[in-house]
Amino acid sequence: MQMVGTEILENIIMNNPKQLTFPWSKPNRSELNDFFFDEKNLKLKDVLLSDEDFFLYGRNKVGKTYLMQSLCNLYAKKDKTSLYIPLKDILNLGPSLLESLDSLDLICVDDINLINGKDNWELAFFNLINNCLTSKCRLIFCASINPSQLLFELKDLESRIKKLDSFEILPV
């Protein structure tokens, strides 16, 4: 039986309360110490290790996904809850997946630009951001484009994301 919406997340939470991943993802052993931070990217390491929300961007294959998964693994080692959300893999499941996630310690969202023009997804992320602001859940968004290039239909969502500090991962 295929589960949809919050049923997937409920099942995941029950199976592993520390690090949450979607059931089709392979085991991930990414670690920040294995990522090469050169002089151009040293500030990024400090931001990753902070408690701040931020927006991460850069060309394809520079390590955005790796860094977010590494951060989720770090949170798991500290007995904190985290969730990596690969939007390209879950858009067809619907935005109800985002309900009640603000109780987590960290949410990393990959390819946030993919929700552009998808009204239900935009509203769900707007609500998630607002809920995380009050619950202290840390949010990290990533895309291959600079956040200044995001053009969401829901302008309140656009302004919330554009207010975040942004960091570009520069190729080595």
What are these regions (language model features)?
Residues E52-M68:
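Walker A/P-loop nucleotide-binding motif
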Residues Q2-V47:
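A short, basic N-terminal segment
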Residues K88-L91, N113-L114, L139, I145-L150, ...:
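Conserved nucleotide-binding/hydrolysis micro-motifs of P-loop NTPases
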Residues Y66-D79:
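P-loop NTPase Walker A phosphate-binding motif
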Residues S100-W121, L128, S135-S144:
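Conserved P-loop NTPase "ATPase switch" module shared by AAA+ and STAND
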Residues P147-K162:
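Short regulatory helix/loop adjacent to the ATP-binding pocket of P-loop NTPases
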Residues A76-L106, D119:
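Short glycine-rich substrate-engagement loop in P-loop NTPases that contacts/grips substrate
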Residues L164-V172:
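Conserved AAA+ ATPase "SRH/arginine-finger" region at the nucleotide-binding site
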